[in-house]
Structure formats: C-alpha cells, structure tokens
C-alpha cells in the first residue's frame, strides 16, 4: 500500500515538473519570438493613410534587416522619444543621399526627381530649410499622409539612424478584411 502511495506521489511530482517545464519552454519561446523575430505593432493616428489606418494591427518583422539593409519605400517601425511609442513611416532617402523637398512638393534625391506614388495630400518641406545630406547610417522617412505626418521633415524626428530601426511592417493582422502581407514596392 505504501509503495502505491509513493508511486502516486512520485507520478504527481513528475507531472507537475513536466507541466512547469512545458510552461517555461512556451514562455521562453514566446519571449524569443517577440524579442528577435516579430512584434505586434498598432498604428496610432492617420500619418500612413491610405496604406495603413488608425487602429490597424501589424506584425513587425525583426529578422530581415539582419540579412539585408532597409530599402527605399520599405515601411519601417522605430521608437520615438520622449514618449514610449513607435512610429511607422516609409523610407524615402537612403544613407549618403541628399534629400530635398521643393515648395511645390516635388521630392528630389541627389538632384533627381523621386518617382513615387505613396504620397497622399500635399508634400511640403515643413521645417526643412534646404537639402538634407544623410549620414552613412541614416534614413529619411515620410508618412504616406504627408499633410499630417510628423516625420523626417521635422527636427523632433529628423533623420533616422539605422540602429533604432526595429524592423519592417510586414503583415496586417487587423482589421480582418484587410489581413495580409504589406507590399511596399
């Protein structure tokens, strides 16, 4: 009888240990995925309309930029201080380039007109006081809704260092009727 009780107690202990290890493994894998693979990001505001809208839920891909550099027109996610929030913007200017926005809204890269059709609303220089030369690891970003976007045209945001780019907006989770990969080309 005592042997049966000991076996039952040992079996319950093994089951508890097994469950604890399983939960720990799930938590560890979840942490690693969120830390290194992807994170959920919510669109706050209308700066990326019509591409993204307020309340859209996205998955940010954190892996791609370990294997290649960001490209022009990628939609990137980066933190914005002093508030602890993320900005979602489109890359317009690449490292080493000169970006200029004329009063008529034309965007120039190294003196050449940038051919793009993402801009919504009027593109104005805002706080830019002439051409902006990007450093070796800096990007110039704009929101698609140019009239309301707080982006690289403003001192508060400025040029974005490569080191703070978390990843690229990759997948729209919500709203469900718009679920799918975000194409940026």
Protein language model features and the residues they cover:
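Structural motif
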Residues: 56, 71-75, 97, 138, ...
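Short, surface-exposed secondary-structure boundary micro-motifs
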Residues: 63, 81, 104, 112, ...
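Protein maturation boundaries and topogenic segments
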Residues: 1-86, 160-164, 168-185
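Extracellular/periplasmic catalytic domains that process cell-envelope and extracellular macromolecules
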Residues: 51, 69, 92, 100-101, ...
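Mid-length scaffold segments of soluble, non-membrane domains
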Residues: 86-112
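Beta-strand-rich cores of mature extracytoplasmic or soluble domains
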Residues: 128, 133-185
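PP2C/PPM family metal-dependent serine/threonine protein phosphatase catalytic domain
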Residues: 109-126
């Amino acid at each position: 009888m005592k042997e049966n009780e000991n076996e039952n107690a040992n079996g319950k202990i093994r089951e508890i240990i097994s469950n604890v290890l399983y939960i720990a493994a799930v938590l560890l894998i979840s942490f690693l995925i969120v830390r290194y693979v992807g994170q959920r990001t919510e669109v706050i505001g209308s700066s990326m309309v019509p591409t993204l809208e307020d309340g859209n839920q996205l998955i940010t891909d954190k892996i791609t930029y370990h294997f290649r550099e960001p490209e022009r027109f990628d939609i990137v996610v980066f933190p914005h201080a002093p508030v602890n929030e993320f900005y979602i913007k489109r890359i317009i200017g690449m490292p080493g380039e000169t970006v200029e926005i004329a009063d008529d809204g034309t965007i120039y890269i190294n003196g050449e007109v940038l051919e793009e059709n993402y801009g919504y609303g009027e593109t104005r220089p805002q706080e830019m006081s002439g051409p902006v030369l990007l450093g070796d690891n800096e990007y110039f970003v704009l929101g698609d809704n140019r009239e309301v976007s707080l982006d690289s045209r403003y001192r508060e945001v400025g040029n974005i260092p490569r080191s703070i780019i978390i990843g690229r907006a990759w997948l729209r989770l919500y709203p469900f009727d718009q679920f799918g990969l975000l194409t940026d080309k």
